[in-house]
Every structure is written in structure tokens, then in C-alpha cells.
């Protein structure tokens, strides 16, 4: 080859553990959202970037789930007048560099102060990209913590086991002070609801005992994300709903989600979306937990 093309430089094929790295195999693992499998094809230094990639994938899968009751999707804006699909997508793109920073900075150890610092910068970037619209603050919190914990474990131990993951998330969240003056904080105070920080400090118990097993049981179902969203809505104290419509609105959302799950159909989803738009109900907290469930499913080795 060198005789034919004098300027030709032959680059050795990348290897991992003495075996050639297959780009096709890596892409297949990424498409499936399988961190453990993908790690077999990449050097250790690449793992944090892979974790961030799977986090972005989870956020986009939630956004792309269509139709969703009361939420922004490819079809409409749900109960929102200040955001649409394009804005939500732009928000995710703005957050991506910070998800990568969280993963890289946490590769050796968890530093709650650093997580908070990057999180604040990420929120500012999100608001700048969206013109001041809070599109992903809740998702940034839960996904950001989880990215840091997952990257730390994957890089230090080569695997993300549920017990260790929950321990790290709980430890990091316990060092983050409670927020004041937010819609979620007000809803938590007024309705005695469990907020996002409390859920994180408890290491998302319902996710591991209920939502994740349910999501995994629906593998191959084209409405897997839709049904999981509805399932989460039946059990979560969604502070987004409480802020907009109070306890009555939350009870209505839970009952309608349970009813639709019993007799599921795509047309039923569309009807529920119309109902939620009319009632000004947006299950944003449930959407955040769907994103988190998708992400955790992609990185965790077990659920116990």
C-alpha cells in the first residue's frame, strides 16, 4: 500500500484486552442501551463518555415517547404553553456537555460539592438555551446524580451494581441542602409530598422495587415507555401536578393513569392527553422518573 500511496499512513486497529474493537458491536450495544456490554469494546478512559451518552439517550427516549398525557412530545406541547419539542431537544443538547463533565469528574470518586457546582452551571446553560424556560431542571438533578455515581462505579470497579449505586447516590444527595422557594419545595411543604431530594437521599426505592422491574418486564413492547410512564404516575407524588392542580389534580391523574393501564390503547393515550390539557395537568415529575428508569436500566447489572 505504501508503494501505491506514498503518503498513506497505516493506523493499527484499536484493541481491548488483546482483541480488536468492533465498531459495529459497540454501536449495537449502545443502541440497546447496555453499558456492561459496551464496556467490553472500549478502553477504560472512554467509559465516562459512554455513561453520558446513555444519559442523553434516556432523556431523548422520554422526549420522543409519543403521545404522552399532558407532556411535550413529537405531536404537541401537552399542557405547556412555554415549551415545545424543539425547545426540549435544544435543552438536552445544552445539558450534554455537563453530563459528560459530571461523568469525567466522578470517574475516580464522588464529590458532592463538584456535582452541585457542575449542576448549577448546567442549569444556567439550559436556561440560556431555552430563553429562561425550565425544561429539564428535575431531570438534570436525578440524572446528574446518577451519572456521577454510575461513572464512579464503572471506572473503579468495572461494573455498576445496584447496592453500591444506591449507596453512592444516597451519600451524595445527603450532602446537598434542601432547596427553598421552588415549585417542588412549595408543593412538598403544602401537601406533605416526598420531593426529589428526599427520593434521591433514599436512593429511589420505588424505582428499584417497582418501576425498573416493571420496565424490564415490558421488553419488546412498542408501548414500553408509555406504560411505564403511566405506571409511575400511579405511585409518585408528582410535585409538578401538585403545583399546578393540587391534591385533587394528583388524585385525578393517578386514577386516570391506572384506568388506562387496565385497558391500554394508543387512542386512550390521546384521549388522556386531551383531558390533561383541559385540566392543566403535566406529570413532569413522572417524566423525570421515566428518564431515570431508562437510564438506570441501561447501566445497572442487577436491581437488588
PLM-predicted stretches and their roles:
Residues 97-149:
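Long, hydrophobic/aromatic-enriched structural stretches that serve as scaffold segments
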Residues 1-50:
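Active-site cores that bind ATP or allylic diphosphates and position pyrophosphate for catalysis
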Residues 132, 280-281:
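Residue-level signal for helical boundary/lining positions with a hydrophobic bias
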Residues 48-108, 112-116, 150-274, 280, ...:
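Phosphate-rich cofactor/ligand-interacting catalytic cores and adjacent structured alpha/beta frameworks
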Residues 22, 91, 139-143, 225, ...:
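Catalytic-loop motifs flanking and including active-site residues across diverse enzymes
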Residues 39-42, 137, 244-245:
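Short coil/turn segments at secondary-structure boundaries
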Residues 124, 140-152, 231, 290-297:
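Contiguous, well-ordered alpha-helical segments that form the cores/surfaces of helical PPI scaffolds
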Amino acid at each position: 500500500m505504501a508503494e501505491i500511496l506514498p503518503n498513506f499512513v497505516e493506523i493499527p486497529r484499536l484493541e481491548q484486552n488483546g482483541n480488536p474493537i468492533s465498531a459495529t458491536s459497540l454501536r449495537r450495544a449502545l443502541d440497546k442501551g447496555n453499558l456492561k456490554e459496551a464496556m467490553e469494546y472500549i478502553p477504560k478512559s472512554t467509559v465516562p463518555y459512554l455513561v453520558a451518552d446513555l444519559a442523553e439517550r434516556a432523556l431523548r427516549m422520554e422526549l420522543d415517547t409519543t403521545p404522552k398525557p399532558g407532556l411535550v412530545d413529537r405531536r404537541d406541547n401537552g399542557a405547556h404553553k412555554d415549551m415545545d419539542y424543539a425547545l426540549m431537544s435544544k435543552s438536552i443538547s445544552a445539558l450534554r456537555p455537563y453530563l459528560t463533565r459530571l461523568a469525567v469528574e466522578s470517574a475516580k470518586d464522588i464529590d458532592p460539592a463538584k456535582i452541585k457546582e457542575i449542576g448549577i452551571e448546567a442549569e444556567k446553560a439550559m436556561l440560556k438555551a431555552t430563553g429562561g424556560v425550565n425544561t429539564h431542571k428535575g431531570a438534570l438533578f436525578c440524572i446528574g446524580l446518577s451519572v456521577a455515581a454510575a461513572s464512579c462505579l464503572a471506572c473503579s470497579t468495572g461494573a455498576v451494581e445496584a447496592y453500591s449505586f444506591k449507596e453512592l447516590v444516597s451519600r451524595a444527595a445527603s450532602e446537598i441542602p434542601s432547596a427553598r422557594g421552588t415549585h417542588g419545595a412549595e408543593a412538598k411543604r403544602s401537601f406533605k409530598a416526598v420531593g426529589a431530594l428526599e427520593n434521591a437521599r433514599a436512593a429511589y426505592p420505588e424505582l428499584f422495587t417497582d418501576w425498573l422491574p416493571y420496565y424490564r418486564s415490558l421488553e419488546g413492547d412498542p408501548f414500553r415507555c408509555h406504560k411505564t410512564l403511566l405506571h409511575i404516575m400511579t405511585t409518585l407524588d408528582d410535585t409538578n401536578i401538585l403545583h399546578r392542580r393540587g391534591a385533587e389534580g394528583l388524585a385525578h391523574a393517578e386514577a386516570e393513569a391506572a384506568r388506562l393501564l387496565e385497558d391500554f390503547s394508543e387512542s386512550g393515550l390521546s384521549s388522556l392527553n386531551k383531558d390533561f390539557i383541559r385540566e392543566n395537568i403535566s406529570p413532569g415529575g413522572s417524566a423525570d422518573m421515566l428518564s431515570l428508569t431508562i437510564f438506570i436500566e441501561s447501566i445497572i447489572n442487577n436491581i437488588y
